[in-house]
């Protein structure tokens, strides 16, 4: 799943209340060093559309301004991998000699889809493809935790 390209955008998919399938809510795009969000027209036209987080991303068309001091909407940053998930991704990238590409969009698009919350990030606006992780044993999980903790590269099976 790791790519050598730098991502320029990510589509934000959301599970709306009472729905079992996600819908594309909008797009997060690079704007210099910032990532800005724009709701999709089809999302805004939905009768059941809800703001992803009203203080930062109210339901309205156009690129939404960033809160002062932030380089991207905080609610979307909260939906991306935490420090441990980023550390695992860094080790995965280090194994592939492209750790320098671990920016925010890479973290969003290369982490697993089975996250807490009702958001996921995809490369497509038309097809939702979950990024699933194969189940591992408790022993394998402990082994990978020890490896990352001690700065050792993960095996391809555990990455």
Regions flagged by a language model, labelled:
Residues 1-159:
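Phosphate/dinucleotide-binding and metal-coordinating scaffold of catalytic cores
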